[in-house]
Structure formats: structure tokens, C-alpha cells
């Protein structure tokens, strides 16, 4: 695995001061870590800090919110990005999940303070409080319309809410344990959930009923993802004709990130197993990059890239630290990942550097939600951070 560059979490504040300093490190497996520092020498005429790096590190482009650092000896470069803005008043405690609406106007988040809130994405102003789950809410997401929210709680209930008036319009009951993740099929006539009870279920929103148990694997399912599978993949055939209430399940595959170190693929309409992949540790999350490629992240810091047509061996394993991989999602021609040590990074195929979203100081970044060139993250420190990406 390639070398990893790290920077002091509050580097942008530290380098605002005259002669301010921030530490750097370059860690390469099997070699001693190279430590260094950045020092501010002054300001350029455009008001951008003039930054010098210690031996072994090179400073590239600097803006008010970003700095490109390379370590030529290890042939590695990282662009560190500071938040454009932070919202610390949405919740009082750790924020466990968030999502941004399709139009970019609203955010929804859940917290260990026991609340789920809808807020304005531009300024963090709270618009609605979604009340009705017993115990903590684990996951929340907007439907594609951006007007409706799906949530899952430790109370084993799945709920659908109106973002406009905060009313709970549907409650799904059937799981025997806390709900850990959800997914939406197409436009949202059907939704999916997975639970500590070891099952993944398909639900009919219109009739608020369970259409099927898609998988029952005897191990908690930590994360799910649904995607259209490549035509060459045999998804199996249903044992009985699908209900007419089932909409958009054909040709889809459901990924299950399991606690028992297994990643499973199931034909969504057929309910038939497609593959079973053994990982190094519990799988926490998974996502599709395309109809052929998908990613899955483990508790010991591995990100597996797999090809749905042949899951015998991974295409690659990305490992930047031993911290749990908590969130994965596709972004442009690459992906965004967040980990339990506060790191959050973006990998793009055509970029020769990694983009590192900084400021969380060793607190897990639980979830990431992109909207166009803005990336929102939520963290154990109770802060929602919004990053502004330049032209990639």
C-alpha cells in the first residue's frame, strides 16, 4: 500500500498566524515515519499564506482553505482541505448519520442526543424536529424527491417522514433488532433495511407492509447497498412470481456488509445468493461505483474494490490506516471514504493526489454526503462540516 500523508488537524488556523507552524508526517508500511512541519513565512499580495515545508516535503498550490503537499521520496501527494463552514449547533452530542436532499437545500441528521433534525444546508438553521422513534435513531436519508425522509432506529422500526411538516406518514414493523442501514429502490415505491437481527427486508411504502425477507444470515448486517448489476451476472430466478407491489427490483443486486466478516451479494428480485466474499474483519459499509465495481469497508481499515462478475479476488485493497472504515460512497470518477480516526478522503481516477478533508481530530467521521461540489460530514465531536471542492 502507498504511503500516507497526515497533517495537524487544525492546520488552517495554525497557519493563519505569523510564523505559525503545523506538523506533517509521511507514513509508509515497513519504513520509519518521516516527520516534518509547515511554517508560515508571510502573506502573498492575494492574501494567501506563503508556506514553507521542512526537509523531505514540498508545498504545492496554497489557497485560504487548501494546501497541496507532496513527499517526493515516497512519490505521494495529498491536497488537504479545511472546512468552508462548520455547524456545531444542530446537535448537542455525537452525530451518527446525515444526508443532503437532492436539491441541496436541506440536511437531515441523527444524534446520540436522541434527536433527528432537518436543517437548512446553507446555514445549519433547524427547520424540523422528527419525533417518534423510541431510543436512538441510527440512520436517516432523503428519498430522491428530497421531500421525504426514511429513518431506522434502535427500536427496530423504520419510519417515513414528511420533510415539510415533520409528520410520520408510515411506520414499518417486523425487524427484531435495531435497524443499522437503509436503501431506496429507484424512486422509492419500495425501500430496504438491514438489522442487528441478521435480516434484510424489502418494504412496500404505499401499503406500509413487508414484501419479503431478502436475506437472513444469522449475523448482524451493518450496511447495505442496492445497484443495477452488469448483464453478464446471473442473479437467479425468483421461486415464485414477484408481487405487483414490487417495483424496480428486477436486474438489481443487494450488497450486505456483515458483522461476521462476510460480504454477500443477493439477487434483489430472486432472493438468491450471488456471491459470498470473506474479508479480514467485520464489514461496516458498502457501495456501488458502477454496474460492475463496488467497494466495501472493514473494521480493521481495509477498503476492498471488487468486480461483481468475479468476486474470488479483489481488484485492489486500499488501506490508509487501521481505523474502521465507516462510510463509503461514489463521487465523480472515484469515491469518498471516512474512518474512525477522523480521516475522510477522496480518491479520483485522474488525480495523482488524494484529497483529505481535515479538522476532525481523531473523532470518528461517521457519514459523508456530497451535493455537487460540496461535501458534508458528521462526526463524533457533534459538528457538521461542509467542504467546498474546487474544479476536479
Swiss-Prot record:
The ranges of the WD repeats are 90-129, 132-171, 174-213, 278-316, 359-392
**Top-level lineage group:** Eukaryota
Instruction: Kindly give the Pfam families that the UniProt entry links to this protein.
Output: WD40 (PF00400)
UniProt KW keywords: Proteasome, Repeat, WD repeat
Q: Does the keyword Repeat apply?
A: yes
Record's GO cellular component terms: proteasome complex
Record note on quaternary structure: Interacts with proteasome 26S subunit ATPases.
What PANTHER family has UniProt attached to this entry?
Answer: 26S PROTEASOME REGULATORY SUBUNIT RPN14, MITOCHONDRIAL DIVISION PROTEIN 1-RELATED
- Which protein family is named in the record? Belongs to the WD repeat PAAF1/RPN14 family.
Its biological purpose is as follows:
Inhibits proteasome 26S assembly and activity by impairing the association of the 19S regulatory complex with the 20S core.
Name of this chain's protein: Proteasomal ATPase-associated factor 1
Species of origin: Gallus gallus
